[in-house]
Regions:
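Iron-sulfur cluster-binding cysteine motifs and their immediate structural context
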Residues: 33-40, 59-78, 88-103
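N-terminal pre-triad scaffold of radical SAM enzymes
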Residues: 5-59, 76-85
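Short glycine-enriched, charge-decorated loop/helix-capping segments at active-site entrances
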Residues: 40, 99, 193-199, 268-276
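FAD-binding FR-type
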Residues: 82, 103-109
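Conserved AdoMet/S-adenosylmethionine-binding subsite of the radical SAM
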Residues: 108-260, 265
Length: 303
């Protein structure tokens, strides 16, 4: 089955060098408590509903052939056991309060969409970034064919990855990838399991593999008070020790933000991020200085 595309973002300047088109795929093996794109976690189509946009015209109830929408205590409720995710209710929703997330693309369709912005790539040194969710856990045959096609057409290809995927997936595609934007969240394995649901051993092993084959590695570290940022920078220092022997092209320190809260409401998912905070600007500079002191030169706060 073809992977589902969550979004195609044009003119991105935060997902690699130059002006880029970022393709977000649905589905991720991690379950990060602070996930900024909860609609990307599921490998299947998701339904999102924004009650603040809804005018309660109830047209969707009348038009749903599966009788999957009802009113309970004045609110519209979707009955998951009846909903076929057919999209019929979307066609009659004048306010756009209802949406289905996830579309299939033939490789030729996706490449055609990407190539619309070729002139921007050429003039800015940009290209395409494949992101997610987790792109490295998508159908390998599809992914391999996509990156080969883009590479053969002279388009710079970046992979934004959490690193939690079979090593053979990286072995298959790395020759046609220009750079990897590689997330490192935590060094401590128990903490990694606590906050993401998975061990970080596979992630760190894949990172070492990419280094061994000479891949261009760009590290991205989300900085979150209460997760990997503390008074003594213990976790950051452990991350530095992991990265020290590797050939790292750049490091992006990404301050936590909570602008995604509305997405959880639209997905009817529990929002668990109230405990997290963005580090102060002083702390961010302190962490940046730590990396500089350890001979990492290309350090940036932000995307």
């Amino acid at each position: 089955m073809r992977p589902l595309v969550l979004n195609i973002q044009k003119c991105s300047i935060h997902d690699g060098p130059g002006i880029r088109t970022t393709v977000f795929f649905k589905g991720c093996p991690l379950d990060c408590t602070w996930c900024h794109n909860p609609e990307s976690q599921n490998y299947k189509v998701d339904f999102m509903y924004d009650p603040e946009k809804c005018t309660h015209c109830y047209t969707c109830i009348d038009k749903c052939e599966h009788h999957a929408i009802c009113v309970k205590e004045g609110e519209l409720i979707r009955l998951e056991n009846k909903c076929e995710l057919c999209g019929e209710c979307l066609d009659w929703c004048l306010t756009g309060s209802r949406e289905l997330v996830g579309d299939e693309y033939e490789i030729s369709e996706l490449v055609k969409e990407i190539e619309k912005d070729s002139i921007f790539y050429e003039e800015s040194g940009g290209g395409v970034t494949l992101s997610g969710g987790e792109v490295m856990c998508q159908d390998l045959k599809y992914l391999d064919s996509l990156v080969k096609t883009l590479h053969n057409r002279g388009i710079d290809v970046a992979i934004d990855t959490c690193g939690y995927a079979p090593q053979e997936n990286f072995e298959q595609i790395y020759p046609n990838v220009d750079r990897f934007l590689y997330d490192i969240k935590l060094a401590d394995e128990l903490s990694h399991k606590k906050f993401t649901g998975k061990s970080n051993s596979l992630i760190l092993n894949n990172l070492k593999y990419l280094d061994s084959v000479g891949a261009d590695i760009n590290i991205r570290i989300p900085l979150i008070e209460g997760v990997n940022v503390d008074k003594d920078n213990k976790e950051i220092k452990r991350i530095i020790e992991i990265l020290r022997p590797l050939r790292i092209s750049s490091i992006n320190l990404l301050p936590y933000h909570n602008i995604m809260e509305h997405k959880y409401k639209k997905l009817d998912k529990e929002y668990k991020c109230e405990i997290f905070k963005k580090p102060s600007n002083e702390k961010l500079e302190e962490i940046k200085e730590l990396f500089l002191e350890n001979n990492f030169n290309n350090i940036k706060i932000g995307g």
